[in-house]
Amino acid sequence: MRSIQSLFVEWLLVLTKKKLNVEGYLEERRMANQLPYVLPEKLKKKYHITKSSMFSVDTYMLKSDVQPDDHQVLFLHGGGYIEQPLVWHWRFLDRLTKQLNSTVYVPVYPKAPNHQYMDAIESVLPVYQALLEKGTPEKIVIMGDSAGGGLSLAFAQYLAKKGLPQPGNLILLSPWLDVTLSNPDIAKMVPKEPMPNLDLLIESGKAYAGDTDETHHLISPIYGEIKSLGRISVFIGTHEFFLPDARKFKEMADKQGVPINYIEYPKMNHVFPVFPIPEANQALKQIVAIIESKTFPLRDMTK
């Protein structure tokens, strides 16, 4: 049964959703993204977030209280490839570090419409290479939500093409797998999904692709090869725009004989694992269990 808290969050999302002038909003983001991201001081103090000086891309770190850590997490945040990290991201990552003995790295990759997909991918590469130097690839997790989930999968495909080691786990939360949003079943999700603006997503995807075909696998990783990648886990809600493509991805994996953890949460909205709801607590427990498990896929993924 769906929690009251999740219904309340959905109500808030519906209540606060605004009609957008897509062209005007993209111009606002273009202007905003010319400036560096500034982590609010209150979040920095509350979650003990530090900034690394090792990389050309601004990269923030959260550490568990127990050191040395067991896992390194490269987290690629969502936001339609045009938005910077939100408060919910930091709250989720703080909870992750408390439940998983880990250090989380959050590179604030370049955003559209100012930058395109290769700018984002290449900005993340030095961070991943640094994690490889710290320990074994099996202890590395690449995780992302929404656009960050799509970028996580595309980045893993990029690593495979370059012959670099795969991470131990790829955790995709409500991933944006196909920026074309051409799956006809997506239209059926519009009445159920209160959060993203479909028209804005379509234009953001075009801006992220630039002059490259939007079906290029590094933009829309559902069109890429997945047999040579690390262990893949997908979390998705049944009230999401991205549900049809997540199901398509699961079918594709099954046909290719690629085992994945695929977890659907009934009546959950976009990126539900980052919200303060009981379903998110359960999803986080599952994420930690997946990362810590030596068996794959997990047999018992009951909610």
Language model segments and positions:
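A glycine/proline-hinged amphipathic helix-loop "lid/cap" segment
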Residues: 1-67, 299-303
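Alpha/beta-hydrolase superfamily serine-hydrolase fold, recognizing
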Residues: 54-60, 64-303
